[in-house]
């Protein structure tokens, strides 16, 4: 076998996007939406080779005639058949390799149900016959990618947001906090407040348009109430145009910052619980008093939902208002934070010291799916 053939694969299965590639690379080769689409209409043109399901970008491009489903919700796989389709697509169509030849590193949100990772392990070994695999915690990988061993990672993706304090490479499980409030909830909320403007987005395909509006137009206000005043008194300062796929142009105003505000005020969507700044603070307060200072100085943002302009400054301000006044707070927001989980996985899987950590096929055959809890943090 040549060197290229036995490279480990790193697959970061997000609720919204799959990031996949080879260990040792500095960016994922394949990034596509975690979507499986099925036709909503009857096929009339025979011989066009219509499929009964489409995955990823192809589903996205044909979304006008498909019903789109995300098999991963809040970081937990809810539809294993569709998940298998996504993995199959990843191996054979995107990376164009055969999974029997490569160890696979998968990622998972912390505090996920145990059954979720057991089933992941089972499918990898039994359906795809991988020689070895490992399941890593997403936030830990993000910290690796930022080149630190100590810090608190605030990871917010499409399905789940979590804060994980890590000290000298050890995650502190008692202080991990998780909120099921993330990008997809923001998209839903944006769709709802756009309805008040008279723009209705109802189908699964139109939801994707809203997601695009969110990614292109939204930002985090430094002072929410002040921003609302500007929006009502000088709307021209805030209004932005967006062109829909059919050429219509819509104007969005205060929605631009009202949407991401949900991260700091979940009560806007009727969710009980604290904003992400408070969750991070509580996470730090659950740690030993001696290490808090180091955590405050290394708050690492990761995940696609932390890509809003202004989020780091706002987070810094919010943390400063609750933390002791003498403490120094530093936010780290790497430019590639959308992919930092994947990058961390790529680093981890190519370390020589990591090679003994893999769960081998032999171990799986001996112990069954529960081996994953013994070998993976």
Curated annotation (Swiss-Prot):
Compartments reported by the entry: Cytoplasm, Cytoskeleton
Molecular function via GO: ATP binding; hydrolase activity
Domain of life the protein comes from: Eukaryota
Family of the protein in this entry: Belongs to the actin family.
Keyword annotations: ATP-binding, Cytoplasm, Cytoskeleton, Hydrolase, Nucleotide-binding
Catalysed reactions, semicolon-separated: ATP + H2O = ADP + phosphate + H(+)
Gene3D superfamilies per record: 3.30.420.40, Actin, Chain A, domain 4
Membrane-crossing residue ranges in chain numbering: none
Protein name from the UniProt record: Actin
Keyword Nucleotide-binding part of the UniProt annotation: yes
Record function comment: Actins are highly conserved proteins that are involved in various types of cell motility and are ubiquitously expressed in all eukaryotic cells. Essential component of cell cytoskeleton; plays an important role in cytoplasmic streaming, cell shape determination, cell division, organelle movement and extension growth.
Assigned EC number: 3.6.4.-
Main location, first listed in the record: cytoplasm
GO cellular component: cytoplasm; cytoskeleton
CDD domains: ASKHA_NBD_actin
Class of this enzyme: hydrolase
């Amino acid at each position: 076998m040549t060197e290229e053939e036995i490279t480990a694969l790193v697959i970061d299965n997000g609720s919204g996007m799959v990031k996949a590639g080879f260990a040792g690379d500095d960016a994922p080769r394949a990034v596509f939406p975690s979507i499986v689409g099925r036709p909503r209409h009857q096929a009339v043109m025979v011989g066009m080779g219509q499929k009964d399901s489409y995955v990823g970008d192809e589903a996205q491009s044909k979304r006008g005639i498909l019903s789109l489903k995300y098999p991963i919700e809040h970081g937990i796989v809810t539809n294993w058949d569709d998940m298998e389709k996504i993995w199959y697509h990843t191996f054979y169509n995107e990376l164009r390799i055969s999974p029997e030849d490569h160890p696979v590193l998968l990622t998972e949100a912390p505090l996920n149900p145990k059954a979720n990772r057991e089933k992941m392990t089972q499918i990898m070994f039994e359906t795809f016959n991988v020689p070895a695999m490992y399941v890593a915690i997403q936030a830990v990988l993000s910290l690796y990618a930022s080149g630190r061993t100590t810090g608190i990672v605030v990871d917010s993706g499409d399905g789940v947001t979590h804060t994980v304090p890590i000290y000298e490479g050890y995650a502190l499980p008692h202080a991990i906090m998780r909120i099921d409030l993330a990008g997809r909830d923001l998209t839903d909320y944006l769709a709802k407040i756009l309805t008040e403007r008279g723009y209705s987005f109802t189908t699964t395909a139109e939801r994707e348009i809203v997601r695009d509006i969110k990614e292109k137009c939204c930002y985090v206000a430094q002072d929410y109430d002040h921003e609302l005043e500007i929006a009502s008194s000088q709307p021209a300062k805030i209004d932005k145009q967006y062109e829909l796929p059919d050429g219509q142009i819509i104007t969005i105003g205060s929605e631009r910052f009202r949407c991401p505000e949900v991260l700091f005020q979940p009560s806007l969507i009727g969710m009980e619980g604290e904003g992400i700044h408070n969750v991070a603070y509580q996470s730090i307060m659950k740690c030993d008093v001696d290490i808090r200072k180091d955590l405050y100085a290394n708050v690492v943002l990761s995940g696609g939902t932390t890509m809003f302009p202004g989020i780091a400054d706002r987070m810094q301000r919010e943390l400063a208002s609750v933390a002791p006044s003498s403490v120094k707070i530093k936010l780290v927001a790497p430019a590639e934070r959308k992919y930092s989980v994947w990058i961390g996985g790529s680093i981890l899987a190519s370390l020589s010291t990591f090679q003994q950590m893999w769960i081998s096929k032999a171990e799986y055959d001996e112990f069954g799916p529960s081996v994953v809890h013994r070998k993976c943090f």
